[in-house]
């Protein structure tokens, strides 16, 4: 629980200690996954937001032709199928553990009740959603950029730690290139 507490204290320094403790008590769902296990399934409604304590994850979208990595989760990050979590509609994605993992989760109902009751947290939640929208715009720019070199460089500049945590084949899928192309770009 200490990593989650430190994470929340850093993100919401204005949240009083009593309210932080109330919020931490709502993070009461622990999950342990083995490599290859799914955190959520396509078609299910995502009811939990998780904080990754250990392990790494990939968020995937599947078409008839291919599996596309659209995001990652790793220690110290929040993880959920955002469209399903926010809308309450069935997921179009699945989340898979790349490495054995431990998470702690908060149920959507509990989170939104806390947002309604706590002005400081509501302000934080709004800012978090704004940051997520801006990150999505950056991701769209990544996908609109024609050059694999540019896509690689943008990710390297924005999130260099991803290259230490995530296998190349998943990063390549995320960048919409072959693993061989990614390997060549990394050698330059």
PLM-predicted stretches and their roles:
Residues 146-188:
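Phosphate-/nucleic-acid-contacting segments
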Residues 47-58, 75-76:
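Glycine- and acidic-residue-biased ligand/ion/polar-headgroup-sensing regions
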Residues 115-118, 136, 158-163:
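Basic, amphipathic alpha-helical hairpins
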Residues 34, 53-54, 74, 99:
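A cytosolic small-molecule/anion-sensing beta-strand core signal
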Residues 1-30:
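Cyclic nucleotide-binding regulatory module and flanking cytosolic helices
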Residues 7, 132-141:
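Short, Lys/Arg-enriched N-terminal segment that forms or immediately precedes the first helix
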Residues 39-44:
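Short phosphate-coordinating micro-motif centered on Lys-Gly-acidic
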Residues 68-127:
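Cyclic-nucleotide recognition modules
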């Amino acid at each position: 629980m200490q990593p989650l507490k430190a994470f929340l204290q850093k993100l919401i320094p204005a949240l009083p200690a009593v309210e932080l403790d109330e919020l931490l008590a709502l993070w009461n769902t622990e999950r342990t996954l083995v490599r290859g296990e799914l955190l959520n399934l396509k078609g299910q409604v995502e009811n939990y937001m998780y904080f990754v304590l250990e392990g790494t994850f990939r968020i995937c979208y599947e078409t008839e032709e291919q599996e596309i990595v659209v995001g990652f989760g790793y220690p110290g990050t929040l993880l959920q199928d955002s469209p399903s979590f926010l809308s309450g509609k069935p997921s179009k994605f699945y989340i898979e553990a790349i490495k054995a993992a431990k998470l702690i989760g908060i149920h959507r109902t509990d989170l939104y009740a806390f947002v309604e009751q706590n002005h400081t947290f509501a302000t934080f939640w709004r800012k978090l959603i704004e940051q997520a929208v801006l990150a999505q715009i950056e991701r769209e720019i990544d996908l609109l950029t024609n050059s694999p070199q540019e896509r690689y460089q943008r990710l390297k500049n924005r999130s260099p730690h991803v290259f230490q945590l995530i296998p190349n084949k998943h990063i390549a899928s995320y960048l919409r290139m072959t693993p061989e192309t990614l390997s060549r770009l990394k050698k330059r």
